[in-house]
Amino acid sequence: MAGHSKWANIKHRKGAQDAARAKIFQKFAKEIYVAAVAGGPDVDSNPALRLAVNKAKSKSMPKVNIEKAIAKASGNSKSSSTYSEYIYSGTVSKGVQILVICLSDNFNRLSSNIKSYFNKAGGQLSKQGSIPYVYQQKGLIEIDKKLISEDKITEIALEAGAEDIQAEDNYYSITCEPSSFNQVSEFIEKATGFSEFLTREVSYIASDYVELDDESSEKVMAFIEKLENDEDVQAVYHNLG
């Protein structure tokens, strides 16, 4: 995998210990709901739902929460909410590329908030829906190094059909094509016996990173945190090195 971001890793460790799990679970529930509405409530026949459920399980989202989100979509629970996906991108602080994935039932609220965040950060929004050239969509699985040896996880990942595995400071990063992600991740889960992963999702990975001084980097990370705290934002990607 090309590139490396120390700021992503710092945030990664912080996120693993984050007490605000309820907010994270709300975002997962929304993703599960949208996938179930679009393709039906059967996990086995709905790849998008299976992806969303596996992602939630990897972060220890309670089974009852997952079932509730699916039931809501299948009509067993009354709701009038209709969510649509929106993608925003832009630059902040000397060329850092930000990609924001959103699910919202109120476009006007979302659009107003995103514009406000970028304006206050001195950033510049690109055309809505555009994805910066530095990003490539990949299936991504990250596993704590303490849980398994490099030789063993490399053997499993290659047998699963992964295209690349990298040993980072504290974790292994495994990537594959998005189209084969469910197959690869489920093979790795079965072969390792792990049900919880640091990351298990289809992600956007940057090929180039922008290096900034610590003060500027901290401002960018504060901006990203503000985006992530928005109820309509599902994920934020950046190429801060």
From Swiss-Prot:
Keyword hit for Transcription: yes
Family: Belongs to the TACO1 family.
Compartments in which it is found: Cytoplasm
Classification via InterPro entries: Integrase-like_N, TACO1_YebC-like_2nd/3rd_dom, TACO1_YebC_N, Transcrip_reg_TACO1-like, Transcrip_reg_TACO1-like_dom3, YebC-like
Keywords tagged on the record: Cytoplasm, DNA-binding, Transcription, Transcription regulation
Keyword Transcription regulation: yes
Annotated source species: Mycoplasmopsis pulmonis (strain UAB CTIP) (Mycoplasma pulmonis)
GO MF annotations, alphabetized: DNA binding
Gene3D superfamilies: 1.10.10.200, 3.30.70.980
UniProt-recorded name of the protein: Probable transcriptional regulatory protein MYPU_6240
Source superkingdom: Bacteria
GO BP annotations, alphabetical order: regulation of DNA-templated transcription
GO CC terms, sorted: cytosol
